[in-house]
């Protein structure tokens, strides 16, 4: 049988998905399985790593069954994962010693406070491109080693293994033959030097993480090891591509050249700009991260996150009951010519890049007796575009690269009003692809490159198909007036504490 399909595994925060992708980059079939969220205390979020593994086995079986494709026809497996989520397991038995601590979880705040107190901020920033925050994996590993009896000692003896979710899945799929991660995931741990491309002794000492438990860091596109036959219907299939979800989306969007950027409009927004083979150190509170490593060289990215995006539209629907379903927001916003001076600052959990203000709260400005729900809905959608411009402007300042176009994906990218306004407020075209599953495509493309389904990035580029290009329609003067109003609104919200 000809091996012409790639199986892409997308291990997310609330569910696991498997997709089969053909040589044309088309999705042939999908299977999805949700799993439980564990909330031991307020602000803590954990997953059962064995349940995640069970969900992966279920979706692999499900998608092969659904598509009637044999395991013999799979040329390779690509993995993309929720980043930063951390597992520590027993090397012999393969059992996790504690739940996986999820990227959203704030349970390591005390460890972070101590690191700040000890003056490690500049060291961490200069070596990892990251900030001290419970978000990243290193403090999660420290927390597990602190809270499980005997764990530190066992880790030092080499009896325990650490990994982000990609590492855990590769280890399980290969029957323990490969304990690895890729550059993109390693760069989110607080332990990896993104300039020297190695686990950093000073950082390991800082968190007292034994080197013996760390995975080997490998390129994002490479044959790492084969599946054990009993996990893949009797077949040994190469696991050949890995990238964290946002980096995978950048790759799946075909953002291969320096200066190309993508925005994923999910619950929040994740913006990444490819900065090429040079790491750009941010002066604006953005993260410097590894995008991927292929063919012996690595590329870097700048990353900015917006905390509230799609969740602002959910707030209109569930909190304020202004719309029945999220997609109605487009219709309401399009009925009027403008928001009539109304601004919504959706700082429900503070503001992310480039403000990094965790104390500011949501606010609405410019209401008059004539304000109706259309203006309110439109202003809420516009806030997503303003925040995106804030981050992209910071990226341009840091990198010295002018953005030419923005590629978009994620749920809210289907909103035509929002995408048009995004183009207008940025002053550059916005491109939405036909296939919105860019994260999965990224993982598939990385694996396919390693096993020869696609020859090179140029061939992959041909499989990126445009759904709609939104051209700039707004005059410069109007754009700057609106954006100035947004900044006034943010400043006023920040003053109200």
UniProtKB/Swiss-Prot annotation:
Q: Which reaction does it catalyse?
A: glycerol + ATP = sn-glycerol 3-phosphate + ADP + H(+)
One Gene Ontology cellular component: cytosol
Q: Which SUPFAM superfamilies match?
A: Actin-like ATPase domain
Q: Where does ATP bind?
A: 13-15, 267, 310, 314, 411
Source superkingdom: Bacteria
Q: How is its activity regulated?
A: Activated by phosphorylation and inhibited by fructose 1,6-bisphosphate (FBP).
Q: Which GO terms describe its biological process?
A: glycerol catabolic process; glycerol metabolic process; glycerol-3-phosphate metabolic process
Residue numbers bearing the Phosphohistidine modification? 231
Q: Name one Pfam family in it.
A: FGGY_N
For this protein, the Enzyme Commission number is 2.7.1.30
Binding of ADP: at which residues?
A: 13, 17, 267, 310, 411, 415
Q: Where does sn-glycerol 3-phosphate bind?
A: 13, 83-84, 135, 245
Where does this protein hold glycerol? 83-84, 135, 245-246
Q: In which pathway does it act?
A: Polyol metabolism; glycerol degradation via glycerol kinase pathway; sn-glycerol 3-phosphate from glycerol: step 1/1
The PTM entry states:
The phosphoenolpyruvate-dependent sugar phosphotransferase system (PTS), including enzyme I, and histidine-containing protein (HPr) are required for the phosphorylation, which leads to the activation of the enzyme.
GO molecular function list = ATP binding; glycerol kinase activity
Keywords attached to this Swiss-Prot or TrEMBL record, sorted alphabetically, are: ATP-binding, Glycerol metabolism, Kinase, Nucleotide-binding, Phosphoprotein, Transferase
The record's annotation in CDD domains points to:
FGGY_EcGK_like
**PANTHER family named in the record:** GLYCEROL KINASE, SUGAR KINASE
Q: What NCBIfam families does the record tag this protein with? A: glycerol_kin (TIGR01311), PRK00047.1 (NF000756)
Under the subunit heading, UniProt states: Homotetramer and homodimer (in equilibrium).
* Family to which the UniProt record says this protein belongs: Belongs to the FGGY kinase family.
What name goes with this protein?
Glycerol kinase
Q: What organism, scientifically named, is this protein from?
A: Listeria monocytogenes serotype 4a (strain HCC23)
Q: Which gene is annotated as encoding this protein in its UniProt record?
A: glpK
């Amino acid at each position: 049988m000809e091996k012409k399909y790639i199986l892409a595994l997308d291990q997310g925060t609330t569910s696991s998905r498997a997709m089969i992708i053909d040589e044309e980059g088309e999705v042939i079939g999908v299977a999805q399985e949700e799993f439980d969220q564990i909330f031991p205390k307020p602000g803590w979020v954990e997953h059962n790593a064995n349940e995640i593994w069970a969900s992966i086995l279920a979706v692999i079986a499900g998608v092969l069954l659904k598509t009637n494709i044999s395991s013999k026809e799979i040329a390779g497996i690509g993995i993309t994962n929720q980043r930063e989520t951390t597992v520590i397991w027993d090397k012999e038995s393969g059992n996790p010693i504690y739940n996986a601590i999820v990227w959203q979880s704030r349970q390591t705040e005390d460890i972070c406070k101590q690191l700040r107190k000890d003056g490690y901020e500049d060291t961490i920033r200069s070596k990892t491109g990251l900030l001290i925050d419970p978000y990243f994996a290193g403090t999660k590993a420290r927390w597990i080693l602190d809270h499980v009896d005997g764990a530190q000692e066992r880790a030092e003896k080499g009896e325990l293994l650490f990994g982000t979710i990609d590492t855990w899945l590769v280890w399980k799929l290969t029957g323990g033959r490969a304990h690895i991660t890729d550059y993109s995931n390693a760069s989110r741990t607080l332990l990896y030097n993104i300039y020297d491309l190695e686990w950093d002794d000073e950082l390991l000492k800082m968190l007292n993480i034994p080197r013996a438990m760390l995975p080997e860091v490998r390129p994002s596109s490479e044959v790492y090891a084969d599946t054990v036959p009993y996990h893949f219907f009797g077949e040994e299939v190469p696991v050949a591509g890995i990238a964290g979800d946002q980096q995978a989306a950048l790759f799946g969007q075909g953002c291969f050249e320096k200066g190309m950027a993508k925005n994923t409009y999910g619950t929040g927004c994740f913006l990444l700009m490819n900065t090429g083979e040079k790491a750009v150190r941010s002066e604006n509170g953005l993260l410097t991260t590894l995008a991927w490593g292929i063919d012996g060289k690595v590329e870097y990215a700048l990353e900015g996150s917006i905390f509230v995006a799609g969740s602002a539209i959910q707030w209109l629907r569930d909190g304020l009951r202004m719309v029945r379903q999220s997609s109605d927001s487009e219709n309401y916003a399009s009925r009027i010519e403008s928001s009539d001076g109304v601004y919504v600052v959706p700082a429900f959990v503070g503001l992310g890049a480039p403000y990094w203000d965790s104390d500011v709260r949501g606010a609405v400005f410019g209401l008059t007796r004539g304000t109706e729900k259309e203006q309110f809905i439109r202003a809420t959608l516009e806030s997503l575009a303003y925040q995106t411009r804030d981050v992209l402007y910071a990226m341009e300042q840091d990198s010295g690269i002018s953005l030419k176009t923005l590629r978009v994906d994620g749920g809210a990218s289907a909103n035509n009003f929002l995408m048009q306004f995004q183009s207008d407020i940025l002053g550059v075209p916005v491109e939405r692809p036909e296939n919105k599953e860019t994260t999965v495509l990224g993982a598939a493309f990385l694996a396919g490159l390693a096993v020869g389904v696609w020859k090179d990035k140029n061939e992959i580029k041909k499989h990126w198909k445009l759904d709609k290009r939104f051209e700039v329609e707004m005059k410069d003067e109007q754009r700057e007036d609106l954006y100035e109003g947004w900044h006034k609104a943010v400043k006023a919200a920040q003053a109200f504490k």
